[in-house]
Amino acid sequence: MPFSPLELIDVRLQVKMFQAGEFRQCWGRSTEMGQDGIGATLTGSLEPGEIVTLEIPLPLTPYPIKVRAIVRYRQGLRYGFEFLTLNDNQRDTIKRVCQYLATRA
């Protein structure tokens, strides 16, 4: 399955995860986003394969969206997340935001 093109986006996001028997969170800054996932630089440490919840404030939306994602890669402090189980509203919102970001590039 081909991934959608990535668009540049710079927003602060929160990452919530369950590690070592407790809930933890960290924050970061996004670097790019596509309809399938988002890249970010984080303050915390995650491993590929971990499942997290991302809270992402997006342009064109009044509230941050909350999405489940899996860590697909890690390069130093940079991470790539693939979105999991998006509902139709989340998918439409992310698609609209990516189209908006593409017009600003």
Protein language model features and the residues they cover:
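C-terminal output/interaction extensions
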Residues: 78-105
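A residue-level detector for short acidic-glycine micro-motifs
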Residues: 32, 71-75, 85
